[in-house]
Amino acid sequence: MPITKDEIIKALEEMKLNELNELVKAIEDHFGVVASVGVAAAAPAEATNAAPTEVSVVMTSVGQQKVAVIKVVKELTGVGLMDAKKIVDGTMPVTIKEHVKPEEAEEMKAKLVEAGASIDLK
């Protein structure tokens, strides 16, 4: 009767680290393969260097033109005047909008900065 996967795994669990290392080397030699972690690990690193597909528009300070900033926040978020005022009067930093395309976020940032606010894109 052939050995099952579960039996192999159980045997591996009982082995010491140096024994596992020797086993990997023996498998590499026997089958002519290389167990390389570096190749598999390189792919996610490339993905993290890609430009983000969504960002958040975060206001770090209101500036001197509070009324102008409230109007822009109202326009950008679609909330009422009182809700926009609550957002602007809230504790900084405050997220104005999440999950925004980078191009749209840049436009929003430009409008808010023009109104006097300080903005970060995260």
From Swiss-Prot:
Keywords: Ribonucleoprotein, Ribosomal protein. Forms part of the ribosomal stalk which helps the ribosome interact with GTP-bound translation factors. Is thus essential for accurate translation. Belongs to the bacterial ribosomal protein bL12 family. Homodimer. Part of the ribosomal stalk of the 50S ribosomal subunit. Forms a multimeric L10(L12)X complex, where L10 forms an elongated spine to which 2 to 4 L12 dimers bind in a sequential fashion. Binds GTP-bound translation factors. The gene is rplL. The keyword Ribosomal protein applies. GO terms for cellular component: cytosolic large ribosomal subunit. The keyword Transmembrane helix does not apply. This is Large ribosomal subunit protein bL12. GO terms for biological process: translation.
